[in-house]
Each structure stands twice: as structure tokens, then as C-alpha cells.
Amino acid sequence: MSKPVTSEVVAESNPSPVVALAVVNYSNRPLFTRVYEHPDWVLPSPRTGETREQQLHYLLFRSLDFIPGQGKSAREMTADGYLGCVNPQEPLPVFAYVTNTGLKILLATTSRGINDIKLKEILRSIHKLYIANLLNPFYVYNTPVSSMKFANKLDELRSLVQ
């Protein structure tokens, strides 16, 4: 039995608009999640006892409902896997990237006006980073990613989003 995915809240002095990210496998099982502190974002009235981290997790995984499944049509997917904003009605937009193997990368931001080209590059880089993690002989496929190197590189990529 694999260990559950852990998420940590990371604080920083010069915040990126990215407030949460997740890497999810083909069966919608989380492999990595991370929530970031952001001073400009105020929670819309949370449910009783709900933390900011729980609210962001819920937002990310609710967005999976808007991503085409395995039986997707050509019109539902783009050639490069970038789906753009998948939840336009939510207070925080979630941008998605899906690979041909069904791996999903979700990025929740405080801004809808992020440059799509830059965002595509960053999501592709996160995908490449996950592939590098797969090449680690000590990583067991389809289990939560616990590598600090992976987490630190994601933080570096996140800082590029402006």
C-alpha cells in the first residue's frame, strides 16, 4: 500500500500568482500537490472548519471534472496537451495540461491574464520534470512523488509565472 499524498504550504516574500499545483495520474489519483501562501488572495467564505489548503485542494480536484477523459475526441484536446483555463466560473482559474498517457498537471492562479505561451512552456517543463522523476530507479510508478529535488524544481518553475 502506498503512502498518501502530502501537501505542504509554502510561504515566500515575492509571490507568484500560482497558489496551488497538482500532478494527477490517469485515474485522477494525486501524485503531487502543493499549496502556496499568497497575500493578495482572500478566501471566499469557506465552509465551517475548512482550511485554505483544503479549499485549494477541492478547487484543483473539482477542475478535473472539466478535463476530457480517456475517450476524448480530437476537438476536446489540443495537439500540445495544453487545455488553458478549465474552470472559467470559479474565483481562481485553474489551467490544465494533459499528456497522451493521461497525466494531468493543474495550476491554480490568482490571475486570468497570464501569458498562455509562457504558461504552456512551464507546464511542459513540469511534465519533463515528472518524466525525469520516472527515470529515478527508486521511484515506484504511480505512487506519490516525495522527491525534494522534484519539489524544489517545481518551486523554481512556479517563480517564472508572472
Task: Indicate residue ranges for each PLM-predicted region.
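Acidic, low-complexity cytosolic segments
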Residues: 2-20, 26-162
